Amino acid sequence: MAQQLSLFGSPEPEETPVTPAPAAAPAQPEPAPEPAAAYASVILDIPTRALSEPFAYGIPEPLANEAQIGSTVLVHFGNRAAAGYIVDIAPELSDLQGNDALDPARIKPVEAILSKPLFTAEAARIAHWMSREYVATLSECLRLFLPPGGSPRVVKGDGGVWTVERPAVKPIQNHWVMLTPEGFDYTPPKTAVRQRQLIEVLQCGPVTTRDLNLLYNSMSATIKALEKRGVVIVEERRAWRGCSEQTTLSSASGKAPVALTNGQQQALAQIERARLDAHGDVVLVDGVTGSGKTEVYLSAIERVLAAGRSACVLVPEISLTAQTVGRFRSRFGETVAVFHSRLSAGERLDQWDMVASGAARVVVGARSALFCPLGDLGLIIIDEEHETSYKQGSSPRYHAREVAAEMARRYRCPLVLGSATPSAEALDRCRRGMYNGATWTRVEMPERPGHAVLPTVRIADLRREFAHGSRSMFSKPLMEGLERVVERREKAVLLHNRRGFAPFLMCRECGCVPTCNHCSTALTYHERTHTLQCHTCGSSWRVQPYPAPTSRCPKCGSRYLAKMGLGTQQIEDALHQMLAEDVAIIRMDADSTRGKDAHKKLLEQFDAADCAVLLGTQMIAKGLDFPEVTLVGVVNADFALKLPDFRAGERAYDLLEQVAGRAGRGDRPGEVIIQTYLPEDPVIRAVAEHDRSIFTDYDLDQRRDALYPPFVRLVNILVWSANRDDAQDYIGRIAKLLKRRWHAAAPDFLRAGSAVPQVLGPASCVIERAKDRYRLHLLVKSPVGYHVSDDIDACLKEVGSVRGVSVSVDVDAYDLM
């Protein structure tokens, strides 16, 4: 079997059956195991909480040269075959950590090597740290470091046969034709027209056989003839898909400015000190919108590359990558790789391989780019560090900022966090000065380069608008602002953080609001498709609301099933009716950006327009740099303010301050108009006065009194099941065990001068039912600095698993819904 599977990677069937060797007859003694040349710690690719540590396997002599840390291997575990990943190798079993008491005679052998090394020993150690920190399985943490398309896996097929499944994504090789030194002097016969054509083309540089065949139908025979004569050579080179992410955005230039501002110089100097100290320290670049944080990043990376090291840059939104990658490639050329989920599987694989091979030394992308195999990592940058998109929504539920800080400590490189609205956690750590052994330093950048100034902010009080008889979605100040933009042929950005046409439908007779059959959420109406859609599970239903003659309430049968509230599609229709036909109205939300490169195409369309309005959800609020934008309007600032979440105010402030920063980034002054029914709210006042402390002082007082982060660590334990009683019983047992554990340890906490962890709940989630599963959760508030994850992991192992019941642990939770 080992011999057969060692051929993995050669062109053979996609699945290879794995048949365990037949057991020996009971009357015959088992043969002595083949002596192991070495021993390996193997993480099994079996996602279960019970397998929380590596297992020891022997490496037979025939595989000794192939087996390396990072290799995927085939092993047997119990009565099944399994894939695993080697994370350590030692000549003796006793040298493997935690395996010194094992009997070598009982150690099973590695059956086959399924892949070359896919990760480093340091990556394996970081995965182990993540597994402990986020109460996740080792295998799912390690998979983050594997190439896109995955590694070989062992799956159970029909008839109970285990098979090795290969990655479906394969590299592509291009064949390049080029002239030899002698070929430049070669003169083909006059009758050899195609030879002359080929040589003329190749004198400009190498060309792929594919392009030659497209230009001249078929050139294969001509190429072979000239190759035999030594005129040309054909060279096989790896094709790098995903490198063509070019953009026409005018703001994507990476040209260095004439001079840095004082704030930029101070930030760059602090980053350089952290780089030279090599302690893994953190620098928070706290710069107002438009203050030139990206130029600080570019200058810092230049120094890192000059020192022979590499850099990783994270951005929060896919819509930002086109601009960011454009600026970085303009400065650093093709040494920049891009990595995000909108690339195809083949493009992601090639970008990953570019990094692994050293062809790319800078990676720009979403949070997953953090796990690309950069050699000698010298700098990590997280732009817009306050963004919640850096928190992974599925297991392992890591936060990119925390993993990056751990990586910076291990690689002894600086971590740079940039934001105009830093998170409460980042600001708190800078106030403390030290966190987890690293120094946290905040550098302010309070001014914009050149003559640019922060925009003026006007508050449109919708209560007064209503009192004066206005029923429009646009206040008088916002309508006048849009008219001025059109007159001056400028551009505007409108934010409305609700996609669809209307947030919900409601029966005007009985008050019924149609909800999803599978979730406890109201359905959103989409005018273009005449559907009600669930934004939780994706289900949809055809509907004709009032005044359509077929409109019917699902509860009482009334035809007055009316559209309620505003969505981006409805605002788009209103703008088309209000503004001149030559004004481009461009909508950016989750519905309009589903296709490949949709973000980039819409932004390029906005950039190229003479006069335009960019309407969208939160994806347009940060990072976009268009000097022609002189007006930003917020259609309704109140949606995010009163959500049942202690972070609601922080998120609302971040969103409003960030979108306000899109205005006035060029030579022309900017104006921001915020429509609200709550003008006295601290969030609205802070944005209007450009004074963050108005909000943060109020918000921190509220969090301190209620014991919320950053004063504690918050863990959300979520349980879901199709049977509510099963979910209730399971989470109740978890809560009971945790309370008992910490009650018994209370004297130890008090002697150490620490608060005792608290358990709140269990209770039903705000979204009580999703995808036909009932959801309950409990919250744990833990003292900062106490590793609560170990306690939770121990309790979950004690409770064990229950059929039909699922559990997840979200450490440093952001989503409590």
Feature-to-residue mapping (PLM):
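Short, flexible, solvent-exposed loop/turn segments with mixed acidic/basic and small polar residues
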Residues: 45, 200, 704-709, 765-771
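Accessory, non-ATPase domains that flank or precede helicase/AAA+ motor cores in DNA-metabolism machines
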Residues: 1-416, 426, 433-452, 487, ...
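Short amphipathic alpha-helix segments
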Residues: 728-760
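Surface-exposed amphipathic alpha-helical segments in non-transmembrane regions
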Residues: 693-694, 700-701, 738-739, 744, ...
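Inter-lobe coupling/hinge segments of SF2-like helicase ATPases
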Residues: 251-261, 265, 269, 279-728, ...
